[in-house]
Swiss-Prot record:
Keyword set, alphabetical order: Isopeptide bond, Nucleus, Phosphoprotein, Ribonucleoprotein, Ribosome biogenesis, rRNA processing, Ubl conjugation
Organism taxonomic ancestry: Eukaryota, Fungi, Dikarya, Ascomycota, Saccharomycotina
Quaternary structure and partners: Component of the small nucleolar ribonucleoprotein particles containing H/ACA-type snoRNAs (H/ACA snoRNPs). The protein component of the H/ACA snoRNP contains CBF5, GAR1, NHP2 and NOP10. The complex contains a stable core composed of CBF5 and NOP10, to which GAR1 and NHP2 subsequently bind.
Cross-link (Glycyl lysine isopeptide (Lys-Gly) (interchain with G-Cter in ubiquitin)): 28
Summary of the function given for this chain in its UniProt record: Non-catalytic component of the H/ACA small nucleolar ribonucleoprotein (H/ACA snoRNP), which catalyzes pseudouridylation of rRNA and is required for ribosome biogenesis. This involves the isomerization of uridine such that the ribose is subsequently attached to C5, instead of the normal N1. Pseudouridine ('psi') residues may serve to stabilize the conformation of rRNAs. The H/ACA snoRNP complex also mediates pseudouridylation of other types of RNAs. The H/ACA snoRNP complex mediates pseudouridylation at position 93 in U2 snRNA. Essential for growth.
Protein name: H/ACA ribonucleoprotein complex subunit NOP10
Family stated for the protein in its record: Belongs to the NOP10 family.
Length: 58
């Protein structure tokens, strides 16, 4: 079982172990993606995050 989440009405995460909520909404994984040193697109991803202000700490 993996920790999953869905967004509540106030925009905060509601954590669960279920894949689908009672209302039929599909949950998302609460775990980050695995890191790979062979990631070919990390430069583009970082550039886009900086451009749109999505990098934490800025």
């Amino acid at each position: 079982m993996h920790l999953m989440y869905t967004l509540g009405p106030d925009g905060k995460r509601i954590y669960t172990l279920k894949k689908v909520t009672e209302s039929g909404e599909i949950t998302k994984s609460a775990h980050p993606a695995r890191f790979s040193p062979d990631d070919k697109y990390s430069r583009q991803r970082v550039t886009l995050k900086k451009r749109f202000g999505l990098v934490p700490g800025q």
